UniProtKB/Swiss-Prot annotation:
The lineage of its organism: Bacteria, Pseudomonadati, Pseudomonadota, Gammaproteobacteria, Pasteurellales. Keywords: Cell membrane, Decarboxylase, Flavoprotein, FMN, Lyase, Manganese, Membrane, Metal-binding, Ubiquinone biosynthesis. Its cofactor is prenylated FMN; Mn(2+). InterPro entries: UbiD, UbiD-like_C, UbiD-like_N, UbiD_bacteria, UbiD_Rift_dom. Pathway: Cofactor biosynthesis; ubiquinone biosynthesis. It catalyses: a 4-hydroxy-3-(all-trans-polyprenyl)benzoate + H(+) = a 2-(all-trans-polyprenyl)phenol + CO2. This is 3-octaprenyl-4-hydroxybenzoate carboxy-lyase. Homohexamer. Pfam families: UbiD, UbiD_C, UbiD_N. The keyword Manganese applies. The active site is at 287 (proton donor). Binds 1 prenylated FMN per subunit.
């Protein structure tokens, strides 16, 4: 990997024309979102706002605004190479015993990568060059973006929240949005199934009414950031996975106010605690669904220490109707999911999460069908195998002659190969995204699977249609004379 920290990565992006420095004064209130949104939709570069209105700290946006930059952040040259990352994760999830010396030799590179999994603990780090504590902490000095006009307050979006349950051996890294409500107060919005929330719940049960320690890193190196959003096995820490991606151990340092280990090269660190008795009403905010979410009470994060580099960069983003940065991340990580799914279900040919489906609410799967009812088995597998798909509402299964990434192909398969009564499977009372206001109950809704495969004996009693195919010899002859026909000659 060609970078060690965020600044190395920005230097790499700038050399490749993938970073634009904006020196003109731009307001974090709405203006940065508008510029970032237009840039992302045009496939443009990462943006470094060097002169944010009213602030001294520059703001970085659209860091992962294209699949290419996500791949670069994972140490790969292009998106297709992300399948290698998926194969590595599949191997780590279920390691296979070598069948021969040759087999052992071929897997040696994967075993060697494991040497980069342990963290390297430093005694001092750049993220603690400047320290503000207690009354000195003032979060209003950070250029926290106010993304949409009806958002209730500025929102921290790219913070890596670091937690540890009282009985767990490893830390958890998760990305949860945080509403600014005071000089040293943020609302920690995490859903109950997420790692940080589970750690907090375990803490409350083991140590009632005691403050729960938390550290939040802003501007960590891309491998660590992406490690927090990648489907790593439960037994593997995000720091360990970042070390695998980077090819070097993740450097960490102990927080000043607690025992949590934080990324040593991060730009800004927030340290503090959650009082189990303190909550606040969060939202509404414009979200990745394209709508404002409902308000709900969540824990309050009290910041006791704010540490940073001497010249920090504030890393931020916005979420809205796709495409946005989370949708781009989802599109790139789609390639990571495929080898993991294929190891469990070898019949899967392709798997696609369309960005228009909020990156996870709809999945299209193509398979090499082998028996009647096969499509339904794959549906159930998608919903149950990885926790990342527990909120996927729709799963469409097609044969391998269909391009999962071409809606024209998929719609043709649905309309010609499926019968609504026979081929639609609806499951009620399943976990659903809390932000999905279409569900009848918050957090609980239904799922639909559509079998758009050709039907086998046992699935239909009718003679099945034969697809039209062109005559190869005729296609070749017309190919040979096509240009001479001059059909599309300029007028």
């Amino acid at each position: 990997m060609k970078y060690k920290n965020l600044r190395d990565f920005l230097e790499l992006l700038e050399k490749q024309g993938e970073l634009k420095r904006i020196t003109q004064e731009i307001d974090p209130y709405l203006e940065m979102t508008e510029i970032a949104d237009r840039t992302l939709r045009a496939g443009g570069p990462a943006l470094l706002f060097e002169n944010p209105k009213g602030y001294e700290i520059p703001v970085l946006c659209n860091l992962f605004g294209t699949p290419k930059r996500v791949a670069l952040g994972m140490g790969q040259e292009d998106v297709t190479a992300l399948r290698d990352v998926g194969r590595l994760l599949a191997f780590l999830k279920e390691p296979e015993q070598p069948k021969s010396f040759k087999d052992l030799w071929s897997t040696l590179p994967q075993f060697k990568q494991v040497l980069n999994m342990p963290t390297k603990v430093l005694s001092k780090a750049e993220c603690q060059q400047i320290v503000f504590s207690d009354a000195e902490v003032d979060l209003y000095k950070l250029p926290i973006m106010h993304c949409w006009k009806d958002d209730v307050a500025p929102l921290v979006t790219w913070g890596l929240t670091i937690t540890k349950g009282p009985s767990k051996k490893r830390q958890n890294l998760g990305i949860y949005r945080q509403q600014l409500i005071g000089k040293n107060k943020l609302i920690m919005r995490w859903l109950s199934h997420r790692g940080g929330a589970l750690d907090f719940q375990e803490w409350k049960e083991a140590r009632p009414n005691q403050p729960f320690p938390i550290s939040v890193a802003l501007g960590a190196d891309p491998a660590t950031i992406l490690g927090a959003v990648t489907p790593v096995p439960d037994t593997l820490s995000e720091y360990a996975f970042a070390g695998l991606l980077r090819g070097n151990k993740t450097e960490v340092v102990k927080s000043i106010s607690n025992d949590l280990e934080i990324p040593a090269s991060a730009e800004i660190i927030l340290e503090g605690y959650i009082d189990p008795t303190e909550t606040a009403l969060e939202g509404p905010y414009g979200d990745h669904t394209g709508y404002y979410n409902e308000q709900e009470y969540f824990p309050v994060f009290t910041v006791t220490h704010l540490t940073m580099r001497k010249d920090p960069i504030y890393h931020s983003t916005y979420t809205g109707r796709p495409p946005d940065e989370p949708a781009v991340l989802g599109e790139a990580l789609n390639e990571v999911f495929i080898p993991i799914l294929q190891k469990q279900f070898p019949e899967i040919v392709d798997f696609y999460l369309p960005p228009e489906g909020c990156s996870y609410r709809l999945a299209v799967v193509t398979i090499k069908k082998q028996y009647a009812g096969h499509a339904k088995r794959v549906m159930m597998g998608v919903w149950s195998f990885l926790r990342q798909f527990m909120y996927t509402k729709f799963v469409i299964v097609c044969d391998d002659d269909i391009n999962a990434r071409d809606w024209k192909d998929v719609i043709w398969a649905i309309t010609t190969r499926s019968d609504p009564a026979r081929d639609c499977t609806i499951i009620e009372n399943t976990p659903i995204d809390y932000l999905d206001f279409a569900s009848p109950i918050a957090g609980l809704g239904s799922k639909m699977g559509i079998d758009a495969t050709n039907k086998w004996i046992g699935e239909t009693q009718r003679e099945w249609g034969t697809p039209i195919k062109k005559a190869p010899n005729v296609v070749k002859r017309i190919d040979d004379i096509w240009e001479s026909l001059n059909i599309f000659a300029p007028k």
